Amino acid sequence: MMTYVVFILSIVFVIGLIGSPSKPSPIYGGLGLIVSGGAGCGMVLNFGGSFLGLMVFLVYLGGMLVVFGYTTAMATEQYPEVWVSNKVVLGAFLLGLMMEFLAVLYVLKEGEVELVFKFSGLGDWVVYGMSDFGVFSGEAMGVAALYSYGVWLVVVTGWSLFVGVVVIMEVTRGG
């Protein structure tokens, strides 16, 4: 069952990535990136990286939502162009979806895809977990290192996101 959840999240991830460059309006490009980021975080959570998935979701998607929210509020169009309003953009989007669908069908029919890795069927996409031999897990040690030794990194990252939002607001407003 979990293999199918990851498979569906992978399809949503690719659809979001196809929808991002074929954007007719900047609002939909940001939406494609946010959908892809959420699906990627879901895949990381499914493979056992609960803290990593949560941190990526909060920091990356939180920062993107703030930036895209402010920029679309400052430079919004009254009637934004959608994917179906331009036949070339719609055709490119549908062509990308069709190519992804054909690649998935080829892999599901026990075909072999050999680019960098060799996939022969859907079972090869599953990551097999190994049991930890230590007392502490890797994620707990990473959290401890982030908040003890890397506290200034967290502060600088938060401040950089704030300054980025202020700069983008000033640039889009023309001030």
From Swiss-Prot:
Main location as per UniProt: mitochondrion
GO MF assignments: NADH dehydrogenase (ubiquinone) activity
Lipid bilayer topology: Multi-pass membrane protein
Annotated GO CC locations: mitochondrial inner membrane
Parts of the chain that traverse the membrane: 1-21, 25-45, 47-67, 88-108, 115-137, 149-169
Enzyme class per UniProt: translocase
Subcellular location per the Swiss-Prot or TrEMBL entry: Mitochondrion inner membrane
Reactions catalysed, as given in the entry: a ubiquinone + NADH + 5 H(+)(in) = a ubiquinol + NAD(+) + 4 H(+)(out)
N-terminal signal peptide: none
Superkingdom, taxonomy of origin: Eukaryota
Keywords, in A-Z order: Electron transport, Membrane, Mitochondrion, Mitochondrion inner membrane, NAD, Respiratory chain, Translocase, Transmembrane, Transmembrane helix, Transport, Ubiquinone
Keyword presence, Protein biosynthesis: no
EC number: 7.1.1.2
Known role: Core subunit of the mitochondrial membrane respiratory chain NADH dehydrogenase (Complex I) which catalyzes electron transfer from NADH through the respiratory chain, using ubiquinone as an electron acceptor. Essential for the catalytic activity and assembly of complex I.
Self-association and partners: Core subunit of respiratory chain NADH dehydrogenase (Complex I) which is composed of 45 different subunits.
Descriptive protein name: NADH-ubiquinone oxidoreductase chain 6
